[in-house]
């Protein structure tokens, strides 16, 4: 069978061929234009963008929890929340799950306080599941907001009120928390408890200076913890390293920790304690700045809550406008826990090197127990400007070198029951 093209289509083909022929005969060829290549990024099968309702008022805990559970059950991956405010109640992280909050993505705690009572107990905003887990990450440039104001007000009216933490992860191997802004927790902001290999970096932790018990980062009975380049501005301890008993039993010490490159604004400084019954050892703090905090370097504990604190080292520390730059207080609450009379706090092997302090109220107060003095304390390269001097009591093996303590009233150093050299 013979086919013929319609006349209009035949004319169009002739015209196109003619134009092509003209282009070939052009004496001045057009410059060569490189072809445009469109690259389609590979699809990451482990990356899931969640489509939750971002109206800031509808509780999204259930769909978020389902996504976490499914992701972990499938072998793990990354769940991403894009720009928006996602209101949630308590959620539980699972193994091999990364939760990423992109810029302007906010997880906002439900304002409904009963949402945080489960089976008669107060639970936290972001929890571990209660058993051992591994490879959990919270990251991104977004915000986790604890919506703490109603809790703070309720606590002022009832100091026995138990309040949620913002993030409380227990028994996790390989925990990473990075990049986020954590703010307005009802109580502590970030608590890794009995975790192994914890990496915390580039966090901003912010709460009003008068918000009660809003600690920044509180590692408890953890091993291998790195805290780097964080800015913490809260109403209580910026960092508090703890090692209390767990269900009444002594457990592993909180050990092998580094804190470096951090900035502390307001709050109560960098503390060890007050719970130290299981011990704290091998802490290195370096290149940190304190501005306007109540305390700088602080160790606080008491009989009934105490244990051995050993091999703790601080270097290259700068403080401005800090009320109490150096504090060791082994009778912190003056309220001994008679349940564990053998849990006596002690400090052995502490060094502070290259410390610069300006505008302090007190140079410091380093006071051990009369029955168990501070042992082996080395202070070197100190430059301190304060209203009153450095008080040391109940300490042995104190070595001081290359120090300048300028005070406006009294002696630079006041000692009682102290043995050592250089002061």
Indicate residue ranges for each PLM-predicted region:
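Bacterial Sec-dependent N-terminal signal peptides
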Residues: 1-33
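Extracellular/periplasmic carbohydrate-active domains that bind, remodel
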Residues: 22-423
């Amino acid at each position: 069978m013979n086919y013929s093209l319609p006349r209009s289509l035949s004319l169009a083909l002739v015209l196109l061929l003619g134009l092509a022929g003209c282009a070939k005969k052009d004496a001045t060829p057009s410059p060569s234009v490189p072809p445009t290549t469109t690259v389609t990024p590979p699809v990451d099968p482990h990356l899931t963008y969640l489509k939750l309702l971002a109206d800031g008022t509808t509780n999204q805990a259930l769909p978020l929890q389902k996504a976490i559970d499914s992701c972990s059950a499938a072998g793990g991956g990354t769940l991403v929340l894009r720009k928006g405010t996602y209101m949630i109640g308590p959620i539980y992280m699972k193994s091999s799950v990364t939760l990423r909050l992109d810029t302007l993505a906010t997880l906002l705690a439900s304002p409904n306080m009963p949402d945080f009572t489960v089976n008669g107990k107060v639970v936290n905003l972001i929890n571990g599941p209660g058993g051992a887990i591994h490879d959990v990450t919270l990251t991104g440039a977004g915000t986790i907001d604890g919506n703490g104001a109603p809790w703070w007000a309720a606590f002022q009216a009832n100091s026995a009120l138990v309040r949620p933490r913002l993030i409380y992860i227990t028994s996790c191997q390989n925990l990473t928390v990075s990049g986020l802004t954590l703010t307005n927790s009802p109580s502590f902001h970030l608590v890794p408890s009995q975790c192994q290999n914890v990496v915390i970096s580039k966090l901003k932790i912010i709460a009003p200076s008068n918000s009660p018990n809003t600690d920044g980062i509180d590692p408890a009975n953890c091993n291998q913890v790195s805290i780097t380049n964080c800015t913490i501005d809260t109403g209580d301890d910026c960092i508090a390293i703890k090692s209390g008993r767990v269900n009444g039993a002594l457990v592993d010490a909180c050990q092998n920790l580094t804190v470096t490159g951090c900035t502390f604004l307001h709050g109560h400084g960098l503390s060890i304690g007050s719970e130290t019954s299981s011990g704290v050892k091998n802490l290195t703090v370096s290149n940190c700045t304190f501005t306007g905090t109540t305390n700088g370097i602080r160790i606080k504990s008491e009989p009934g809550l105490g244990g051995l604190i050993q091999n703790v080292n601080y270097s290259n520390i700068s403080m401005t406008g800090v009320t109490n730059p150096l504090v060791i207080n082994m009778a912190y609450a003056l309220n001994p826990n008679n349940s564990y009379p053998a849990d006596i706090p002690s400090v052995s092997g502490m060094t502070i090197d290259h410390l610069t302090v300006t505008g302090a109220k007190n140079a410091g107060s380093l006071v051990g127990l009369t029955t168990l003095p501070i042992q082996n304390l080395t202070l070197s390269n100190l430059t301190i400007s304060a209203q009153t001097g450095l008080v040391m009591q109940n300490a042995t093996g104190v070595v001081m070198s290359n120090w300048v303590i300028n005070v406006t009233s009294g002696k630079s150093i006041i000692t009682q029951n102290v043995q050592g050299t250089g002061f």
